[in-house]
Amino acid sequence: MSDDSELTHVTDDGDAQMVDVGEKPDTARRAVARGEITLQPSTVAAIETNDVEKGDVLAVARVGAIQAVKHTWETVPMCHQIPITNVDTEFSTSETAVELTVAVETTGKTGCEMEALEGVTTGLNVVWDMVKAAEKDADGQYPDTGIDSVEVIEKEKRAL
């Protein structure tokens, strides 16, 4: 952190506060986040062929990701409720992973990167929930399963 940066969600006394964005002009904003869940190759193959007992994993995860984007303000304490104008979700698979990319757009006074991150993490949690029976080992643990590399990969702000 640079010397001139300050924590915007904390008062001088150290109390939590929501940032006042009331005076900021509306701008067009877009944020893209990504992450991946590592799985056993047999689980990824079952997802790709829609052969998972609970149903279409990626369809359910897509709905979960979109719902999470729309409800970020309810789960991240200092997030503003923003008007979401668009959500795009994209899944890709490799032999041992499912990657989810979520792009969020809004027009308003504050960005939407937290919404994109919330969409990714919830979407990947839904994947885990849908395949957990296949991922458990004999002891009920998940030695091959993990959510990793969650990050914001793009952020845009354009004047209207």
UniProtKB/Swiss-Prot annotation:
Compositional bias (Basic and acidic residues) = 1-12
Its UniProt pathway annotation is: Cofactor biosynthesis; molybdopterin biosynthesis
**Gene Ontology molecular functions:** cyclic pyranopterin monophosphate synthase activity
Residues binding substrate, per UniProt: M78, C79, H80, M114, E115
* E.C. number: 4.6.1.17
Segments for region (Disordered): 1-24
Extent of the signal sequence: none
Entry keywords, A to Z = Lyase, Molybdenum cofactor biosynthesis
One Gene Ontology term from the biological process aspect of the record: Mo-molybdopterin cofactor biosynthetic process
Catalyses which reaction(s)? (8S)-3',8-cyclo-7,8-dihydroguanosine 5'-triphosphate = cyclic pyranopterin phosphate + diphosphate
- Going by the record, the broad EC class of this enzyme is lyase
Instruction: Tell me which residues this entry annotates as catalytic.
Output: D129
Family annotation (InterPro entries): Mo_CF_biosynth-C_arc, MoaC, MoaC_sf, MoCo_biosynth_MoaA/MoaC, Mopterin_CF_biosynth-C_dom
Protein family according to the UniProt entry: Belongs to the MoaC family.
Tell me how this protein assembles. Homohexamer; trimer of dimers.
Known function:
Catalyzes the conversion of (8S)-3',8-cyclo-7,8-dihydroguanosine 5'-triphosphate to cyclic pyranopterin monophosphate (cPMP).
Kindly provide the name given to this protein in its UniProt entry.
Probable cyclic pyranopterin monophosphate synthase
Q: Gene of origin?
A: moaC
